């Protein structure tokens, strides 16, 4: 039993080194090429799928579209969920990571980006960046007095929405024999990787997921993890992962 994860290709705000979170930005031409290459790599390795999952954000949706084009599988069913969205970066969304590191220090930015349970400063009610008034989320209702949609998130918060969705919606499909592809985001996929690999809070801080590169997990029938590998040129995969690690440095 296999599961393939792909982080979306480079987005416009990745290129500009801005905190993105739930801001709905497009792919760059480079990001489109990364997505196409990810699809070609899967096709050359003989992968096929029955079911796809992605987020509400266009950079992931379009990455999936490019992958499916490369596989000649554009007709496959696709399930979209906000629970696979990127981690919400709160009031940091739209800020330059390098400038933020210069202002607050690299260590503080690293804590915001890579710690497990520290959330950035939240958005305030009425901020135009809040998802609560955006058309994409009009079907997502509040639960009681506590809004379902976040104003900010730590990775711990992201795990709390991603993992139940995986366990309740995706894993049963895999167990039934469906071949699943998930295209999502750096932190929503890190949340899932933490769960699948049983990583602790320190280990997950060191994980940098490259853009557009298929990550293949293999499982026994009882869902015991028995294999993990990236598909693609090893040097290219390492270079993309290092580029992610270098974000948020002051120089």
Curated annotation (Swiss-Prot):
GO biological process: gluconeogenesis; glycolytic process
CDD domains on file: HP_PGM_like
Keywords carried by this UniProt record: Gluconeogenesis, Glycolysis, Isomerase
Binding positions (substrate): 7-14, 20-21, 59, 86-89, 97, 113-114, 186-187
SUPFAM superfamilies, sorted: Phosphoglycerate mutase-like
Active site as annotated: 8 (tele-phosphohistidine intermediate), 86 (proton donor/acceptor)
Covalent S-S links between cysteines: none
Record's keyword annotation contains Isomerase: yes
Entry similarity comment: Belongs to the phosphoglycerate mutase family. BPG-dependent PGAM subfamily.
Purpose of the protein: Catalyzes the interconversion of 2-phosphoglycerate and 3-phosphoglycerate.
Name by which UniProt lists this protein: 2,3-bisphosphoglycerate-dependent phosphoglycerate mutase
Species of origin: Treponema pallidum (strain Nichols)
Origin organism lineage: Bacteria, Pseudomonadati, Spirochaetota, Spirochaetia, Spirochaetales
Gene that encodes the chain: gpmA
